[in-house]
């Protein structure tokens, strides 16, 4: 959109791994993100972005990125079916065994 105007463009970087930014345009594009140093040497991010789809639907994604990887969340993302009961039971057994100190290397 050539006529889109920047409504918000705020950035803060403390130089120690902590930062924040926010950006928004008049055509509905928005993003924000904060970052902090992680406990295992990684950077931890938390943020979101949104924009309007061609049909007028607002697409919004929130996310966390840390030592566990990128973890997006959105109503637009597909969700797999739940694990069947026998798989859930196996996961419970594995958790019990880990709690008892049992490992399988």
Swiss-Prot record:
PROSITE patterns: CHIT_BIND_RR_1 (PS00233), CHIT_BIND_RR_2 (PS51155)
Ranges of residues in domain Chitin-binding type R&R: 16-81
Family matches, as InterPro entries: CHIT_BIND_RR_consensus, Cuticle_Struct_Prot, Insect_cuticle
GO cellular component, one term: chitin-based extracellular matrix
Tissue-specificity statement: Arthrodial membrane.
A molecular-function term among this protein's GO annotations: structural constituent of chitin-based larval cuticle
Protein name stated in the entry: Cuticle protein AMP1A
């Amino acid at each position: 959109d050539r006529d889109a105007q920047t409504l918000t463009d705020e950035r803060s970087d403390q130089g120690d791994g902590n930062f924040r930014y926010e950006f928004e345009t008049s055509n509905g594009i928005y993003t924000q993100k904060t970052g902090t140093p992680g406990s295992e040497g990684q950077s931890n991010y938390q943020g979101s972005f949104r924009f309007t789809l061609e049909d007028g639907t607002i697409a919004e994604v929130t996310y966390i990125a840390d030592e566990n990887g990128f973890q997006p969340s959105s109503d637009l993302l597909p969700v797999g079916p739940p694990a069947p009961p026998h798989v859930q039971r196996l996961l419970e057994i594995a958790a019990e065994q880990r709690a008892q100190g049992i490992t399988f290397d």
